Amino acid sequence: MGFFSFVQDIAIDLGTANTIIISDDKIVVDEPSVIALDRRTDKMIAVGNEAKMMYEKTHENIRTIRPLRDGVIADFSACEQMMRGLIKMVHSGSRLFSPSLRMVIGVPSGSTEVELRAVRDSAEHADGRDVYLIFEPMAAAIGIGIDVEAPEGNMIVDIGGGSTEIAVISLGGIVSNNSIRTAGDDLTADIQEYMYRQHNVKVSERMAERIKINVGSALTDLGDEAPEVFVVHGPNRITALPMEVPVCYQEIAHCLDKTVSKIENAVLSALENTPPELYADIVKNGIYLAGGGALLRGLDKRLTDKMHIPFHVPEDPLHSVAKGAGVALKNLDRFNFLMR
């Protein structure tokens, strides 16, 4: 982006858990979708990582908000302020003036017109001049490197923080899709509840996320890839005294089983509704996992064993949607038909 550029292209994956922004083919923002506001004035105090550090630690004059729930905007004003704050990070201090923004944003394929309008309005209020929307499974497919215009079927399972998107793509369109509001946040909540019930220890959402990252698993037998035991610190829910609880991946796999089964059933349901010719392509090509949920240990193997169809985890599943949205915006002439 040159000194005299008046328009800047940015691609945004506006997620329930994290927001990723790509500009000039580089990930320039990868921050939690959290904002801290002053209760008295509603002015932004912090955004992203800085706001997440305050999460569940604030006093009465500060409130921390996650503006998205289940993949869609739950708090319009907070979302607008959060987007504005995160977009400022893209060009902070690098220019004498802020350029006009041309942006593309990934949205869930099951979004209603009202939900799409909310995203567009938030982006426009956050200084977006030209705002395009692209369905997340399509963006993920492009980001993974799939030829979405090819006359063959490909299935994408995008497991985000708030929703899981399952879509069959062929000839540049979504032939069928299934969106469920079961995803990474549910896995985190499962861990919180399990630690409370099984070990009598209260853990914060942030600590539950750390447990998920360190010992989260979809299988009770990971063989040589088994992670080390993770030690959890927290207060005893009965005595309030500090506790140390060693947690292994096998027990976390048991506690996540119900939520993982819901994702399995959603994939099976999507396969049932897939036309036979495209189904044959999917069996041949395999199914691609995207989103942060794709990083859950053993998930690809569990799904492969259950469906008898190979599941693939791309190199960087967390950034597939943002990367694909960036490619689509950069090649707008070619991918204009995908934009909303």
Q: Each predicted region: which residue ranges?
A:
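Nucleotide/phosphate-binding catalytic cleft detector across ATP-hydrolyzing
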Residues: M1-I159, A167-I287, A294-R340
